[in-house]
A protein has these predicted regions:
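A membrane-topology feature that recognizes alpha-helical transmembrane segments
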Residues: 1-156
């Protein structure tokens, strides 16, 4: 029951995140914190306090890695390649899927973003090297896919 309820809430929060990021180009801190808190609560309820600590450490490590990648990209290119809200979201997502689920999350997000960019290009919207897109909705879909896959895989 906890798994189903937490996943349903994650779906609702992810939809909110996608809508806000598409509309305003930001991912609010309160939303990232809510997703992180829900993931930590789920980990503690299902696995105990040490599972929550492990999930928190994995989320923090993932957030730190992507923050470093963001800084390195800016250092070399002098433009932002990944928003800070995306970095914080990846840290929160890391609590949900851990290091093991991160490749699936990123692959799904990148493939969906690439497909959408291709559709936009075919529809006549010109995309250039400096074009920016809101990556949060794609990360949210990647999180839902990776989390759903992990929960199904572990339950069945």
């Amino acid at each position: 029951m906890v798994i189903i309820l937490s996943f349903a809430l994650l779906c609702l929060l992810s939809a909110s995140l996608a809508w806000i990021d598409i509309r305003h180009g930001i991912i609010p801190d309160w939303l990232n914190l809510t997703i992180a808190g829900l993931g930590l609560s789920k980990a503690v309820i299902l696995g105990g306090p040490f599972a929550g600590l492990e999930a928190a450490c994995e989320g923090a490590a993932i957030g730190a890695i992507f923050w470093l990648l963001r800084r390195l990209y800016f250092t070399f290119r002098k433009i932002q390649g990944l928003g800070l809200g995306d970095v914080k979201f990846l840290a929160a997502a890391g609590i949900w899927v851990g290091v093991a689920g991160l490749p699936m999350l990123l692959l799904v997000a990148a493939l969906i973003a690439l497909a959408c960019a291709g559709v936009m290009q075919l529809a006549g919207r010109p995309l250039h090297a400096q074009s920016s897109i809101s990556f949060g909705p794609y990360l949210a879909l990647g999180l839902l896919f990776a989390s759903g896959f992990q929960q199904y895989w572990l339950c069945c």
